[in-house]
Amino acid sequence: CSYCADPNTPATWRQLAATAGTGALGDLTAHIVSLSDMIVGKEIVEVFASWDTPYAERPDARDSSRKLKIDTDDQIYVIVKYEDGRIGSMSSSRVSVARPVSLAYEIQGSKGSVKFEMTRINELLYYSNGCDPKERGYKIIKGNTRNGDYANFCGTDEQGIAYNEIMSIQAHDILTAITEDRKVDIDIAYGQYVDTVLEAMATSAREGRWVKVSEMQETV
């Protein structure tokens, strides 16, 4: 994200550890951890993180004549280990000048790869290692009326959904679960698990070492 890319952007509660705890880690990386769980299907068990705050001071949002010390991270980079031994990497930034709002992932496997970028929300890039070598390369798979809730917003293919529709789908699923008195995959207990992973990342960034998520389970 780029909402802090301008060093003259006033400091609010999100930039202060006393009110926000962490910066890009808590605000942005939580989404990546949740996405990783869904896509990889394995929990993160160990992390190594490094974070950075390029702009040490910002104007006070309540008094522009004052400067406030920024004590939260503007960007963080993490190596993660999953419970099955696989490794991955994550990064979050709120000072990326060219990416106002972005979320992306890439998975590399022995049989191929998939890539996704939120700014092209209706497209999934797919690479197959089993196709004719002359035809190898990423191919675009487009969302259509046979995929999920797409047809609830679009009468035909190629129309496309956007971020606001995704939020509507989330709200619908949560409210439906409440009215039907059933559990959802993302609940308070899961939120606590994500916080445990984030705390392990924060501890790693502060102490400069690999941290097991299990070390944090009694502190979150």
Locations of regions flagged by a protein language model:
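Glycine-rich phosphate/pyrophosphate-binding beta-alpha loops
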Residues: 91-100
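C-terminal glycine/acidic-rich active-site capping loop/insertion
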Residues: 38, 52, 59-73, 77, ...
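C-terminal capping/lid region of NAD(P)-dependent oxidoreductase domains
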Residues: 11, 203-220
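Beta-strand scaffold of nucleotide-dependent catalytic cores
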Residues: 89-92, 116-117
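Short, hydrophobic secondary-structure boundary micro-motifs
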Residues: 47-48, 185-187, 211-215
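Predominantly a Rossmann-like dinucleotide-binding segment in NAD(P)-dependent oxidoreductases
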Residues: 1-70, 124, 208
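Stable alpha-helical structural segments in soluble proteins, enriched in small hydrophobic residues
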Residues: 162, 166-170, 198-207
